[in-house]
Curated annotation (Swiss-Prot):
<keyword id="KW-0269">Exonuclease</keyword>
<dbReference type="Pfam" id="PF02609">
    <property type="entry name" value="Exonuc_VII_S"/>
</dbReference>
<keyword id="KW-0963">Cytoplasm</keyword>
<comment type="subunit">
    <text>Heterooligomer composed of large and small subunits.</text>
</comment>
<protein>
    <recommendedName>
        <fullName>Exodeoxyribonuclease 7 small subunit</fullName>
        <ecNumber>3.1.11.6</ecNumber>
    </recommendedName>
</protein>
<dbReference type="InterPro" id="IPR037004">
    <property type="entry name" value="Exonuc_VII_ssu_sf"/>
</dbReference>
<comment type="similarity">
    <text>Belongs to the XseB family.</text>
</comment>
<keyword id="KW-0378">Hydrolase</keyword>
<dbReference type="GO" id="GO:0006308">
    <property type="term" value="P:DNA catabolic process"/>
</dbReference>
<comment type="function">
    <text>Bidirectionally degrades single-stranded DNA into large acid-insoluble oligonucleotides, which are then degraded further into small acid-soluble oligonucleotides.</text>
</comment>
<dbReference type="InterPro" id="IPR003761">
    <property type="entry name" value="Exonuc_VII_S"/>
</dbReference>
<dbReference type="GO" id="GO:0008855">
    <property type="term" value="F:exodeoxyribonuclease VII activity"/>
</dbReference>
<dbReference type="GO" id="GO:0005829">
    <property type="term" value="C:cytosol"/>
</dbReference>
<dbReference type="GO" id="GO:0009318">
    <property type="term" value="C:exodeoxyribonuclease VII complex"/>
</dbReference>
<keyword id="KW-0540">Nuclease</keyword>
Amino acid sequence: MAVEKFETALKKLEEVVKKLEGGELSLEDSLKAFEEGIKQAAFCSKKLNEAEKRVEVLLKQKDGRFITEQFQPEDE
């Protein structure tokens, strides 16, 4: 199975939302679309969590040098 990219999964999720909001799907098709949407949302959430762990903030020191620190969200 090919590795899916975040952007691809997000686009699929947006398409599912559009279909569901359209109100044209049968109950069965709505459930299938909802299930696919949950799958794509979970994938996107996982990828965002992985990215957050990798983000580094570049800080400029008074002497002009730059250092890196691990990203710390404000709520931590």
